[in-house]
C-alpha cells in the first residue's frame, strides 16, 4: 500500500511541475489605441510607398529588329579588346572556355511547343570541344575567328563553364551576323 501512495504522489508532483512551466498561448498584438499619437497623419498620395508614379517614365525595349540575346547584349557590341578582357576574366576565375554557334536563330524561340524545352533556341551547337587547360585568351579569340570564317551567318557566343560545380557561369555573344 505504501508503494502505491508513493507512486501517486510522484505522479502528482510531476504533473504540477509541468503545468508550472507552460507558456500562455499567443493572443495577438495589442492595440496601439492606448498610445499617444506623436506624428500627424499625412494623407498626401505621394507619401505612400509605391512606384506607380515612376511607371510613366519606364520604357519597353522594342523587340522588332532589335533582338537581345544575353545579359551583355543590351550594351553596344564588344570590341576585340573588350572581348579579350571578358575572356581573361573567364580564365582568371578558372572557368573552361567553350564556343557555341547558332546558324538560324540567335535568340530563344518556341517552334514545337509552348513550354520550354530542348528545341526552343537555348541550346546551340558546340564549336569543337571545350577548351580544357586553356590559359591564353588569344587562343579563344583565334577560335572565334575560325568559327566566323566557317559560319559567317551564325551567332557565336563564348561560355565559361565551371567544371567543378558543373555549371555555366558566364555567357556572352562574341559575334553576330550582319544586320543584327
From Swiss-Prot:
One of its GO terms (cellular component) is chloroplast. The keyword Chloroplast applies. It is found in: Plastid, Chloroplast. Pfam families: RbcS, RuBisCO_small. Residues 1-56 form a transit peptide. Heterohexadecamer of 8 large and 8 small subunits. RuBisCO catalyzes two reactions: the carboxylation of D-ribulose 1,5-bisphosphate, the primary event in carbon dioxide fixation, as well as the oxidative fragmentation of the pentose substrate. Both reactions occur simultaneously and in competition at the same active site. Although the small subunit is not catalytic it is essential for maximal activity. Belongs to the RuBisCO small chain family. This is Ribulose bisphosphate carboxylase small subunit, chloroplastic 5. The gene is RBCS5.
Amino acid at each position: 500500500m505504501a508503494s502505491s501512495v508513493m507512486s501517486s504522489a510522484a505522479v502528482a508532483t510531476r504533473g504540477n511541475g509541468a503545468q508550472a512551466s507552460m507558456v500562455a498561448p499567443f493572443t495577438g498584438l495589442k492595440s496601439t489605441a492606448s498610445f499617444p499619437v506623436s506624428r500627424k497623419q499625412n494623407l498626401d498620395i505621394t507619401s505612400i510607398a509605391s512606384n506607380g508614379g515612376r511607371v510613366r517614365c519606364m520604357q519597353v525595349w522594342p523587340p522588332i529588329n532589335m533582338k537581345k540575346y544575353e545579359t551583355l547584349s543590351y550594351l553596344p557590341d564588344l570590341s576585340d579588346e573588350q572581348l579579350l578582357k571578358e575572356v581573361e576574366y573567364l580564365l582568371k576565375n578558372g572557368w573552361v572556355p567553350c564556343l557555341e554557334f547558332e546558324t538560324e536563330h540567335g535568340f530563344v524561340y518556341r517552334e514545337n511547343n509552348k513550354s520550354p524545352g530542348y528545341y526552343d533556341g537555348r541550346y546551340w551547337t558546340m564549336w569543337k570541344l571545350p577548351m580544357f587547360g586553356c590559359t591564353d585568351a588569344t587562343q579563344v579569340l583565334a577560335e572565334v575567328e575560325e568559327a566566323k570564317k566557317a559560319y559567317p551567318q551564325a551567332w557565336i557566343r563564348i561560355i565559361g563553364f565551371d567544371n567543378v560545380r558543373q555549371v555555366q557561369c558566364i555567357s556572352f555573344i562574341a559575334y553576330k551576323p550582319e544586320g543584327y
